[in-house]
Amino acid sequence: MASQKPNLAALSAAGVSVWLDDLSRDRLRSGNLQELIDTKSVVGVTTNPSIFQKALSEGHDYDAQVAELAERGADVDATIRTVTTDDVRNACDVLAPRWEASGGVDGRVSIEVDPRLAHETDKTIQQAVELWKIVDRPNLLIKIPATKAGLPAIAAVLAEGISVNVTLIFSVDRHRGVMDAYLTGMEKAAQAGHDLSKIHSVASFFVSRVDTEIDNRLEQIGSAEALALRGQAGVANARLAYAAYQEVFEGDARYQALKERGARVQRPLWASTGVKNPDYSDTLYVTELVAPHTVNTMPEKTLDAVADHGVVKGDSITGTSGDAQQVFDKLEAIGIDLSDVFDVLESEGVEKFEASWKELLDATQAQLDALAK
């Protein structure tokens, strides 16, 4: 049996679930996903519109299926839904042994609702239920963005007994709203008679994009004090989010009542962990965010960097919230408007996924049109 890379094994031992932020048919067919499970501690997969747009635009892995769907008269939305849910279902099957071995904590695969629905509560709920039924695997997570319209959708979908990955969380305030939606949804699920131990949720907190936006603003200020704060906000923000998670899931009476009925914690998931600034360590958003009951979803480049030279020294979050708050106090003192930062990041996050989805729609439509000639 293949052995796990020591640095990634150390990360797992410290309580961090290693998930891969990528999926493609080639990765499934070639056995590469299984290889990453066997050698790089991967116990889950996340997808998003950008990942599927890239997968479908490269190579010819989807051509035969798209041609078959075209022959059947499928429109572009149905075509994309079929090919993406097929990949996700197959990934769920590859990860099923990890799901079983972890008692349902890991072995999870995420698929996102159409990003064009990010500000429409009812349509998000409807599509989440549809995707859950189409994929039809217990280790699926439905990704719903943490927009204001997304929060009630999250609660409603959980109430149906459906597992949810809440995505596009940038601020601790919004993270608190997400945890509240989780508790509300689980309370309703309990009232409806669902087995709470079967419902899983993670809260995907984006890291590197926070640094990118705040670093740009610090460079515009340009003072020595401002420049000295570059590269600190992303990690500090995530550490404050973990402290908020501990408040709710280690002491809140609402959660304790649900826990007695089998509910699990809603784990923080560190997303956007690929380092975008070449001046920073390429493992920064992994080694600095180690704590029990967390998930880190990584692009393969980051996964490889951690395997090669990531130094994992155990828990690097617990007890750091005071220092993290100081970073934020300094940012505000020199004129960084944090609420504006988070508003910009959320709207940009939705726009990026919408743009990827449009590219995917346009490319698939062109393929369908060519086949119709």
Curated annotation (Swiss-Prot):
Protein's name in the database: Transaldolase
Main location (coarse class): cytoplasm
Name of the gene: tal
Leading EC class: transferase
Residues at the catalytic site: 143
Organism: Mycobacterium ulcerans (strain Agy99)
Mitochondrion as UniProt keyword: no
Taxonomic superkingdom: Bacteria
NCBIfam families on file: PRK03343.1, tal_mycobact
PANTHER family: TRANSALDOLASE
Keyword annotations of the record: Cytoplasm, Pentose shunt, Schiff base, Transferase
Biological process annotations from GO: carbohydrate metabolic process; pentose-phosphate shunt
Family membership: Belongs to the transaldolase family. Type 2 subfamily.
Known pathway: Carbohydrate degradation; pentose phosphate pathway; D-glyceraldehyde 3-phosphate and beta-D-fructose 6-phosphate from D-ribose 5-phosphate and D-xylulose 5-phosphate (non-oxidative stage): step 2/3
